[in-house]
Curated annotation (Swiss-Prot):
Methanesulfonate monooxygenase (MSAMO) mediates the primary degradation of methanesulfonic acid (MSA) to produce formaldehyd and inorganic sulfite by initial hydroxylation of the carbon atom prior to spontaneous cleavage of the unstable hydroxymethanesulfonic acid. MSAMO has a restricted substrate range that includes only the short-chain aliphatic sulfonates (methane- to butanesulfonate) and excludes all larger molecules, such as arylsulfonates and aromatic sulfonates. All MSAMO components are required for enzyme activity. It comes from the Bacteria. InterPro entries: NTF2-like_dom_sf, SnoaL-like. Keywords: Cytoplasm, Monooxygenase, NAD, Oxidoreductase. Belongs to the bacterial ring-hydroxylating dioxygenase beta subunit family. It is an enzyme of class 1 (oxidoreductase). This is Methanesulfonate monooxygenase hydroxylase subunit beta. It holds the Pfam family SnoaL_4. The MSA monooxygenase system consists of 4 proteins: the 2 subunits of the hydroxylase component (MsmA and MsmB), a ferredoxin (MsmC) and a ferredoxin reductase (MsmD). The hydroxylase component consists of a 3 alpha (MsmA) and 3 beta (MsmB) subunits. The keyword Membrane does not apply. MSAMO is inhibited by metal chelators (such as bathophenanthroline, bathocuprione, neocuprione, alpha-alpha-dipyridil and sodium EDTA) and by sodium azide, sodium arsenate and potassium cyanide. Induction: The msmABCD operon is induced by methanesulfonic acid (MSA). It comes from Methylosulfonomonas methylovora. The gene is msmB. GO terms for molecular function: methanesulfonate monooxygenase activity.
Amino acid sequence: MDIQTEMTAPPLSGGLDPAQARDAADAVRNAIYRATILLDSQKWDEWLALCADNFVYDIKAWSPEINYDMTYLHGSRKDLEALIRLLPKHNTDHSPLTRHTTIYTVDVADEGATAKGVSAFIVFQHLLDGTNSHIDAGESRLFLVGKYYDTFRIENGQALFTSRETRLENRRLDKGSHWPI
């Protein structure tokens, strides 16, 4: 008896062609990692260029004391553009931040036009100034830990952020940490 079986990969996402689903997932991963690099470099306008016009950004943390979500920042793309223009005029901590992002999941919708991603992040702060700058300057410390919950619109092979919820595990943000995380 001669039986032949053909092995085919199951579709990665509903009825979407597997190659298209892989390309869309790669575009999402590229957008997440590119966003990390641009945020580290404080290239705010280039970071916003990765975002759709209807982009919404949130920084939140769960508070067990009040049994409620705390919202540190909520804004549209227009709100973030204004924030980025104004922040250099504020008293800010100029210590650079370095993010380490690890993508957990990328789920491309059946039609291939939208996707969701979940990533973990760790942010290190490299101290330059502050109350104890004579002691702390030059030190690097763990600053934030959390997850990104992103949604995307995929157009012409590129993934544009339509929302990012930055969900913090820690609940203390220092002075001058108003920049997008």
